[in-house]
Swiss-Prot record:
HAMAP family: MraY
Name of protein: Phospho-N-acetylmuramoyl-pentapeptide-transferase
GO molecular function, one term: UDP-N-acetylmuramoyl-L-alanyl-D-glutamyl-meso-2,6-diaminopimelyl-D-alanyl-D-alanine:undecaprenyl-phosphate transferase activity
Keyword Endoplasmic reticulum: no
Pathway the protein takes part in: Cell wall biogenesis; peptidoglycan biosynthesis
Main location: membrane
GO terms under biological process: cell division; cell wall organization; peptidoglycan biosynthetic process; regulation of cell shape
Family: Belongs to the glycosyltransferase 4 family. MraY subfamily.
Annotated EC: 2.7.8.13
The keyword Transmembrane belongs to this UniProt entry's keyword annotation: yes
Designated gene of the protein: mraY
Pfam families associated with the record: Glycos_transf_4, MraY_sig1
Reactions it catalyzes: UDP-N-acetyl-alpha-D-muramoyl-L-alanyl-gamma-D-glutamyl-meso-2,6-diaminopimeloyl-D-alanyl-D-alanine + di-trans,octa-cis-undecaprenyl phosphate = di-trans,octa-cis-undecaprenyl diphospho-N-acetyl-alpha-D-muramoyl-L-alanyl-D-glutamyl-meso-2,6-diaminopimeloyl-D-alanyl-D-alanine + UMP
A single Gene Ontology CC term: plasma membrane
Amino acid sequence: MLYWLIDFSSSFPAFNVFRYITFRTGGAVVTGALFVFLCGPWIIDNLRLRQGKGQPIRADGPQSHLVTKRGTPTMGGLMILSGLTVGTVLWANPLNPYVWIVLAVTLGFGFVGFYDDYMKVTKQTHAGISGRTRLLIEFAIAGAACFALVWLGRGSLSSSLVIPFFKEVVLNLGWYFVIFGAFVIVGAGNAVNLTDGLDGLAIVPVMIAAASFGMISYLVGNAVFAEYLQINYVAGTGELAVLCGALLGAGLGFLWFNAPPASIFMGDTGSLALGGMLGSIAVAVKHEIVLAVIGGLFVLEAVSVIVQVASFKLTGKRVFRMAPIHHHFEQKGWTEPQIVIRFWIIAVILALAGLSTLKLR
């Protein structure tokens, strides 16, 4: 909404500052963080009061979690989504369609996760919505978003897969891109969901990825920088940097309460929404493959589950002591802080590797 203050810049020249995406991105970071900092305690108290026993802990998971995690409320994603939405609505250009498409995916996935968390808490079981039903809803949301993105672009690039490291190598998938893009968004959402198993493990890599895609969005949406870096220019996507800033700020606020020992878990409400948001931004700015690099930690977690399940069904043997892979290291004797901080380091390295694709052509 503050973007509209530009209309008064002729009378108040200071309002010209709202033209700049960088300034509004910074404002979104601060707004998202302050909102969660200030409202977080109230939200946590209300969730704890309503949930009683908190998030149910899996009996077949690490036994230490039955003691250290029991009674902690979930649905903390509500804090993140609230801060993210307030920061976005306040600082983003309300006339930019990319903003609303990505925000719709984020809140849509958040609603699916919220209902899943609600089912788990009320029934005190780790089984929420059936996997098939959840995936169908996620694919419907993601497919609609990808259709809108292709229609919005109305050009060959909008339906193409861009190959990093090469100057002008693109694969035009036509309308099949809608299917591909939906898989990217749904895959990202569920990969982040699988990563969210230890205090602070998911939110920091999400913030790292958000900061990275904030930079990518700004560069892709700027014709001058895009030409200099020889990357594909997508008009209007620079505004997505503001959303990334709002997510970064809200994530910082949430980490304050999610730092071990966590006062609250983000739950599926947060993890599905944030993963879906990263996936939809990657699709919008034509950096789907780069997402697999920057979000490589999430890919690793998801692949570890796929490999574990496939191996057990085919051979009756497990590759890992427990999946996702962060539980494997728990079973090997690594402490929770060791796993979390080491995975953060991996996330930083992967983000730098992903950002390097912008220059290596």
